[in-house]
């Protein structure tokens, strides 16, 4: 009779599944706290907060798409733009909350872009985008602290917030 060997399971302590991702979404009351912060004495934080909220208001628009959003993309009460990542065309109804943010920074950019992210037509656009997202993410961490949030705030959070609330 053949002898049976005991099963050894050499990888029983090795995790081979998919680990749970950290939730990046904030509850609506946290978004409200961010919105209601008085940042008038800290314009760089005010700007970062506004860009974050603009992303949230525009159904979680990615920062790259916001950076390259043109004034001509806004027509007849809608924004029509093509996602950089996928090429998918999206249409978003233009709301007063979006208008308020754009109006606040209206004189800041003489470029074709809607938001003052890429502001220097003579400089490399990709570099301006990278520098802007870096500065804004640093500022958003301070905004989160001032709002009493116990998680770091980033531009990517705005996408998750919208997706979890929608």
Describe the residue ranges of each PLM region:
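Short, basic (Lys/Arg/His-rich) helix/loop patches that form interaction surfaces
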Residues: 36, 40-43, 108, 137-166
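Basic, Lys/Arg- and aromatic-enriched nucleic-acid-binding interface segment
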Residues: 4-63
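Conserved tyrosine-mediated DNA breakage-rejoining catalytic core shared by Y-recombinases
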Residues: 6, 12-13, 58, 68-104
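Active-site lining segments that contact anionic ligands and/or coordinate catalytic metals
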Residues: 29-31, 48-53, 76, 87-89, ...
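Generic recognition of stable, solvent-exposed alpha-helical segments in well-folded globular domains
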Residues: 26-29, 46-49, 61, 93-100, ...
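Active-site/catalytic core of tyrosine-dependent DNA strand-transfer enzymes
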Residues: 30-31, 95-150
